[in-house]
Each structure stands twice: as structure tokens, then as C-alpha cells.
Amino acid sequence: MTVSTCATQLPVVTSTLLENAPVAKGIWKLRLGSAEIASNFVPGQFVMLRIADRTDPLIGRALAIYSADAKVGTQRSWIELVYQVKGRMTTQLAELVSGQRLELWGPLGNAFSDKVVEHLVMVAGGIGQTPFLT
């Protein structure tokens, strides 16, 4: 008998770009309409992202969820992702405008523990600090 601990299928969610704006030199924030992901997100998780209808780059990129607002029962739920413009994919992301479509799968990854501890040390640098801001 085998026990599977992995999902057999991870649905892809097509999301609409609501906002794409620079927040610092070379750092951008995406706001995407996504009720499915916003309502299931737990701080510390990420999504895989691809630009819809493009095959270059073929492989999606992992981006930490910066913020989310799940407005239950409405179409106004969103998630925010922060990224650094560094390569081909992020350069293409920075050129996107509101209304364009992206493909997401997630939320993925282990969320932060909510266990109360006496001492906690968290270390992050650069764009890697995004999940700590949620």
C-alpha cells in the first residue's frame, strides 16, 4: 500500500492584473484579482506565476505573496506580489498593464508557524524579505 502525500493535480487559476507599479528602484508590486488564492492563502506561502498565452519563458516563477484580501462572496478579492526586475521574466512582468491575464497556481509552500515562542530570529535579505512582510 502506498500513501501519497502530494497533490495529484494543482489547478491553474487565470487572474487579471489589477495594478502593476514600481515601489522602489527595480522593485515592483503586482495586484492580481484572485478570489481562489486570496481565500486560501496563509502568510509565508507563495504562488507560481506565468504570463498567460506566452511560452517564453516557459517555466513559471515562484513569487511570495506580499498581501491578500479575500472579500468573500464578491469578485473584488486580490493578492499582491512583490518582485525585483532582474531577468527576462521579471522584465516582461514590469511591462504588463492592467487588464492583462496571468496564470497562477497555489498557494504553495509551508506557511509560517503560529506557535508562540519566547525568542524568534528571522533573517532575510533583498527581495527575500517579502514573505516576512505578510
Q: Over which residues does each language-model region extend?
A:
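Ferredoxin-reductase
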Residues: 2-98
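FNR/FR-type flavoprotein reductase catalytic core
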Residues: 88-134
